[in-house]
Curated annotation (Swiss-Prot):
Name listed for the protein in its UniProt record: CTP synthase
GO cellular component: cytosol
Subunit-structure text: Homotetramer.
Summary of the function given for this chain in its UniProt record: Catalyzes the ATP-dependent amination of UTP to CTP with either L-glutamine or ammonia as the source of nitrogen. Regulates intracellular CTP levels through interactions with the four ribonucleotide triphosphates.
Family annotation (PROSITE patterns): GATASE_TYPE_1
Chain residues that bind CTP: S13, D147, I148, E149, K187, T188, K189, P190, T191, Q192, K223
PANTHER family, A to Z: CTP SYNTHASE, CTP SYNTHASE-RELATED
Pathway listed: Pyrimidine metabolism; CTP biosynthesis via de novo pathway; CTP from UDP: step 2/2
Activity regulation, per record: Allosterically activated by GTP, when glutamine is the substrate; GTP has no effect on the reaction when ammonia is the substrate. The allosteric effector GTP functions by stabilizing the protein conformation that binds the tetrahedral intermediate(s) formed during glutamine hydrolysis. Inhibited by the product CTP, via allosteric rather than competitive inhibition.
Length: 545
């Protein structure tokens, strides 16, 4: 029997609902419960797959190929025993699309289709399906209480709390306690009004997570409890922390997990062992060195566009006991600036992306890393550009490019793949006319690493499984001239022998991959590719120190 914790936010957005929810999930998992998480997004897009990173940040890809909200990345990084799937994230657009398709098929037998019950029932069905087979499902509702877009979701939550009952549901509400400097005082009124908004919908919160920059005394907590109908011990203070990985310990010390276990009847569980989280924080706060990684991209003004890459570098720093300082370099400005701005970097990374804009700047950075012997990691488009740069400047194919940038090129080193097998082994097809949404090679795919290569050495095994999100691949017609010039194809997809990884054997550390290793990195376990990359950066730092 699954228990549900619904997570809402009030006063302002960006309070950290996802991190708070993931921290609670980590606590419950540490007590032995089987936990999953769900993110409900009120926007009308079917999924974030075609949204600009400037609008939405990164698109997180699950094992089964769902293009989802970046919060699912937090969920997976905080949980060890649960992987997110297509069931764990859905939007208003997805719900309305499903309901309208049913209406067109005649499933509603000519009845009037309405928000209540048709939309709300669809939402409830999705929540219940995602929670099936778990002890606890933590369900985050995107946006802020009172937003018009989120009303169907809030009504669905209200109905579920009534239908499932008090002993199977809880609501955790995040709110802001602003500090007024002129009065030297924390203000509780925004929290009171936020809860009032919830109550007007018919929902009473059970736990309040109060975000603040300052300590909160017992009197203030009692005042909040009095005016919100919440127990004083359920008013949880979430003061700004040095790292998000301190939040599980913070919640543990305020007995958030005890509150939940009491409510759900989990009275005989062992206490949570958070020693692994303590080790993560200890390594973060006591680095031996600082290494600088230049990340060359076109969305660098918004770090959330590369959230999982940023986190994977942080995790690799933990593994190597170094602090990773990321220097964001705009690829377009690099085309007009002196390339020597990269001279302070201990390593260079070119992440994934789409489109031609900024590609010349990225290739300048790749060439610099290759010629100067600086550790380089290319991801997705970063791999494709590494191959193009090598083809142009080493293999003698001066006009080499991708058909993404020039469909009529005579040297299509990178081309559109028209057929591939999905994660279920089923044939998928596309063409240049296909819709952008949902037409990529997505999700976990097996690859075989070539024996004797650095990539094989880094992973420590022959077969790996990594997640993909791309339309274009290296053209196998050009493998021979590329390898003859010195670049090594070090990995191929198991199913179709597509190029997955390349490296330059004569370089200290130059690896580029078609997949997205950042999606499977975690603070407690890291990822072998990023760990090796930062180890190489550390050696580069010590060499040039």
């Amino acid at each position: 029997m699954t228990h549900f914790i619904f997570v809402t936010g009030g006063v302002v957005s960006s309070l950290g609902k996802g991190i708070s929810a993931a921290s609670v999930a980590a606590l419950l998992e540490a007590r032995g419960l089987k936990v999953t998480m769900v993110k409900m997004d009120p926007y009308i897009n079917v999924d974030p797959g075609t949204m600009s990173p400037f609008q939405h940040g990164e698109v997180f890809v699950t094992e089964d190929g769902a293009e989802t909200d970046l919060d699912l990345g937090y969920y997976e990084r905080f949980l060890r025993r649960a992987k997110m799937t297509k069931l764990n994230n859905f939007t208003s657009g997805r719900v309305y699309q499903d309901v309208l398709n049913k209406e067109r098929r005649g499933d509603y037998l000519g009845g009037t289709v309405q928000v209540i019950p048709h939309i709300t029932d669809n939402i409830k069905e999705r929540v219940l399906a995602a929670g099936e087979g778990y002890d606890v499902a933590i369900v985050e509702i995107g946006g802020t209480v009172g937003d018009i877009e989120s009303l169907p979701f809030m009504e669905s939550v209200r109905q579920l709390m009534v239908e499932l009952g008090h002993k199977r549901t809880m609501l955790m509400h995040l709110t802001l306690l602003p500090y007024i400097r002129s009065a030297a005082e924390l203000k509780t009124k925004p929290t009171q009004h936020s809860v009032k908004e919830l109550l007007s919908i018919g929902i009473q919160p059970d736990i309040l997570i109060c975000r603040t920059e300052h300590d909160v005394d017992a009197d203030t907590k009692r005042k909040i409890a009095l005016f919100t109908n919440v127990e004083a011990r359920a008013v949880v203070v979430c003061k700004d922390a040095k790292t998000i990985y301190q939040i599980p310990r913070n919640f543990y010390e305020q007995k958030v997990d005890d509150l939940i276990c009491e409510r759900f009847g989990y009275n005989d569980l062992p206490q949570a062992d958070l020693s692994d989280w303590d080790q993560v924080c200890e390594a973060l706060f006591n680095p031996e060195y600082i290494v600088r990684v230049a990340m060359v991209g076109k969305y660098v003004e918004l770090p959330d566009a590369y959230k999982s890459v940023n986190e994977a570098l942080l995790h690799a720093g933990i593994q190597n006991r170094v602090k990773v300082q990321i220097d964001y370099v705009d690829a377009e400005t690099l085309e007009t600036q002196d390339i020597s701005i990269l001279s302070t970097a201990d390593a260079i990374l070119v992440p994934g992306g789409f489109g031609e804009r900024g590609t010349e700047g990225k290739m300048l950075a790749i060439k610099y890393a290759r010629e100067q012997g600086i550790p380089f990691l290319g991801i997705c488009l970063g791999m494709q550009l590494a191959v193009i740069e090598y083809a142009r400047n080493v293999a003698g194919l001066a006009e080499a490019t991708s058909t993404e940038f020039n469909r009529s090129t005579k040297f299509p080193i990178i081309g559109l793949i028209t057929e591939w097998l999905d994660e279920r082994g089923e044939l998928q097809q596309r063409s240049v006319e296909s819709d952008l949404g949902g037409t990529m090679r997505l999700g976990a795919q097996k690859s075989e690493l070539v024996e004797g290569t650095k990539t094989r050495q880094v992973y420590g095994k022959a077969e790996i499984v990594e997640r993909h999100r791309h339309r274009y691949e290296m053209n196998d017609r050009f493998i021979e001239p590329i390898e003859k010039a010195g670049m090594k194809i070090s990995g191929y997809s198991t199913a179709q022998h597509l190029v997955e990884t390349v490296e330059i054997p004569e370089h200290p550390w130059f690896i580029a991959v078609q997949f997205h290793p950042e999606f499977t990195s975690s603070p407690r376990d890291g990822h072998p590719l990023f760990a090796s990359f930062i180890d190489a950066a550390k050696k580069q730092h010590l060499k040039t120190k």
